[in-house]
A protein has these predicted regions:
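N-terminal non-catalytic cap/leader segment that marks the start of a structured domain
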Residues: 1-113
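Glycine-enriched loop-and-adjacent helix/strand subsegments that border the catalytic/binding cleft
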Residues: 91-155
Length: 155
């Protein structure tokens, strides 16, 4: 299951990718209209804190939408949403490991990956969505090193 965060009609929502389609299930709307679950998290962060139970809740909502006579109403085409980063804002700093593979260390000017682990943090505001414009801050730096390697595995 690939969970996505997005904005539609100025509302931040989340849901899983629709299999074999360029669309996402609006699980927030499914729960709102079909009232499948007794309790459902309001944000993706709240859901992630539930662990595997959250994955099961999302599966139940998608199953209910697929069985509903007008279940297609809960699918939103990618062209109708504004992408957000998978986790729009983390509650704490993000721990990172720098130069953790040889090719990256070499492209940064080293001969090989360092022997000792290189840990640093990123602010919650450092997260950007796919295709988002990144601020350059030319008054502070003349180059950026950006990578897209954020993942959460539940289960």
């Amino acid at each position: 299951m690939k969970l996505l965060s997005f904005k539609v009609n100025e509302q931040v929502k989340f849901g899983p990718k629709v299999k074999k389609e360029e669309a996402v299930w609006d699980v927030v709307e499914i729960q709102k209209q079909l009232n499948v679950l007794k309790d459902f998290p309001e944000t993706i962060i709240d859901g992630i804190t539930l662990g595997y139970d959250f994955v099961e809740q999302v599966r139940k909502l998608v199953d209910a939408a697929q069985k509903h006579e007008d279940g297609a109403q809960f699918k939103l085409a990618y062209s109708h949403i504004e992408w957000l980063s998978p986790i729009p804002r983390t509650p704490k700093n993000i721990l990172c490991v720098g130069k953790n593979y040889n090719d990256h260390a070499v492209e940064m000017g080293a001969e090989k990956a360092p022997e000792d682990i290189m840990i640093f943090t990123k602010s919650p505001t450092a997260i950007a969505a796919d295709e988002a414009t990144l601020p350059v801050h030319a008054e502070l730096t003349d180059s950026l090193d950006y990578e897209g390697e954020l993942a959460i595995v539940i289960g």
